Structure formats: structure tokens, C-alpha cells
Amino acid sequence: VHLTAEEKALVTGLWGKVKVEEFGGEALGRLLVVYPWTQRFFDSFGDLSSADAVMGNPKVKAHGAKVLQSMGDGIKNLDNLKGTFSKLSELHCDKLHVDPENFRLLGNVLVCVLARHFGKDFTPAAQAAFQKVVAGVANALAAKYH
């Protein structure tokens, strides 16, 4: 993904303030609530019957944290997102059969979560930079799809 030096500084500066467990659980939880068809990939997570159940589900929180840890790896390797996400792309494509559109949806939800937590610090320039990053990550995760 191509970011200017200013965009990279915005992304890395804000990412350093991300509370991975909290924001990750919230982002994945919101995805599962707003786009309920994505729940089919999480059958083993137990109770996803309501928004409260999803948002309080410890497996959702744990997997959300894992997702954001991977996102952090991507942010450290913005010039090689495809390489960084190669194994995860393979896993989600070949074994889990996740619709790659879900990566885009989660990226957009994550941007909303960041905006909610960072308020005024999440400037229009920061949002634009993060939109580029989540689009790049979604494309990298979709790379192994045929």
C-alpha cells in the first residue's frame, strides 16, 4: 500500500495507542452484529444470539485481539502486506473458506472503532490513511483466492 511519509506517521502514531484486546474485540463484535451472516464462520464461539451476547463473548474478544495483533504486524510491514499476510490468506481461503469481502467489511468496522476511541485525534487525514491501510490488508488477505 502506498502511503506518504505523513500518512505513515499518522498510522503508526495512532496505532501505538491502540488497545489491541479492547479495540479488537469491539471491531470483531461489531462486524458480527452488523453483518450477522459473518457469524457462520464462528460456530465454535458459542452464544452469538444477540448483540449483548456477541459483545460479551470471550472468544469474540480473544479472536478480535488476534486480528488486531496481525493488523499491527501489517502496519510494521506496510511495504510488504502480501508477504506479511500470505499464510493467513492461505488459511482463510483454503481451509476456512471465508468470503474475502468480509475482510473489507472488518476493515471498515475497524476504522469506525478507531474513530470512536480516538475522537478528535482521528482526523480526516488519519481516517484516509487508515482506509488505505485496511484496504491494503483486505487485498493482501484476498491474494490467495482463485
From Swiss-Prot:
Domain Globin residues, every copy: 2-146
InterPro entries on file: Globin, Globin-like_sf, Globin/Proto, Hemoglobin_b, Hemoglobin_oxygen_transport
Modified residues (S-nitrosocysteine): C93
Protein's UniProt name: Hemoglobin subunit beta
Any GO molecular function: metal ion binding
Organism the protein comes from: Erinaceus europaeus (Western European hedgehog)
Known function: Involved in oxygen transport from the lung to the various peripheral tissues.
Residues modified as Phosphothreonine: T12
Modified residues (Phosphoserine): S44
A family per Pfam: Globin
Quaternary structure note: Heterotetramer of two alpha chains and two beta chains.
Tissue spec. comment: Red blood cells.
Keywords (A to Z) from UniProt: Acetylation, Heme, Iron, Metal-binding, Oxygen transport, Phosphoprotein, S-nitrosylation, Transport
